[in-house]
Amino acid sequence: MEGQEDYQLLYEGRRSQPAPEEQEASALPRGRRQRGVEAGEGSVGREEARGHRRSQHRDRLGGGSMGSNVIGLPGVNPPTSEVVVLEPRSFDEMAQVIQYLRERKTVIMNLTLMDPAEAQRSVDFVAGGTYAIDGHQERIGENIFLFTPSTVTVSTPSSQGMPPLQRPLQSPTPLWPSGYEHLQAVGQH
C-alpha cells in the first residue's frame, strides 16, 4: 500500500499546480502543445513517476531485474504440437500436406497405397515445400516419410552420437519347425 500512497501524493502534487511549461504550452496549437510538453522539463517528472511505478510493479512480481521486460501471462498455455498421419491415395492430396506444414504441424505420410511413380512425385513435391519453409524431412520406413516444420527438430540415434540400430541381413531362423514341415513328419509316421 505504501507504493499506492506515494503514487497518490505524486499524482496530486503534480496536478495541483501546473508546470510553467504546461501553461505556456496551452497557448500553442494542439499538435505543437503535445510535442512541446513532452520535450519540456515537465515530462521528466512524469517519466520518473512512470519508472517508479514500473519498479514497484516489478518488485511485487518478484522480477526486480532490469534486464527483462517479459512477464508471464497467467492462464495462457504454450501451443501444443500436432502430428498428422496420412495415407494419401493420389498426388491431389499433397496440397493439404503443405498446408499442414505451414500451420506448423508435423506430418507422417505412408505412401504404400500409391503408385510408386506418383509416390515419388509426391515425396519430391512435399520435400520442396518443406525446404521452402526451412523444415526437415526424414525417411522412417519403406514408403513412410516424416516432414516437420522449422519449429520441430528431428534427431536420430546417429545424430546424437549413438550407434545406429543394427538390422539383421536375413530373417532369423525359427526355433520350432514350421507348420508344413511338422505335417510332413506326422504323415511319415
UniProtKB/Swiss-Prot annotation:
Which HAMAP family does this entry report, sorted A to Z? SepF
Compartments (UniProt record): Cytoplasm
Family per record: Belongs to the SepF family.
Q: Where is this region: Disordered?
A: 1-75, 155-174
| Keyword set, alphabetical order | Cell cycle, Cell division, Cytoplasm, Septation
Q: Which GO terms describe its cellular component?
A: cytoplasm
Q: What does this gene product do?
A: Cell division protein that is part of the divisome complex and is recruited early to the Z-ring. Probably stimulates Z-ring formation, perhaps through the cross-linking of FtsZ protofilaments. Its function overlaps with FtsA.
This protein is called Cell division protein SepF
Q: Which domain of life is it from?
A: Bacteria
Could you provide one GO biological process annotation from this protein's UniProt record? division septum assembly
The top of its lineage is: Bacteria, Bacillati, Cyanobacteriota, Cyanophyceae, Synechococcales
Q: How does it assemble?
A: Homodimer. Interacts with FtsZ.
Q: Tell me which Gene3D superfamilies the record gives.
A: SepF-like protein
Originating organism: Synechococcus sp. (strain JA-3-3Ab) (Cyanobacteria bacterium Yellowstone A-Prime)
Q: List the disulfide bonds.
A: none
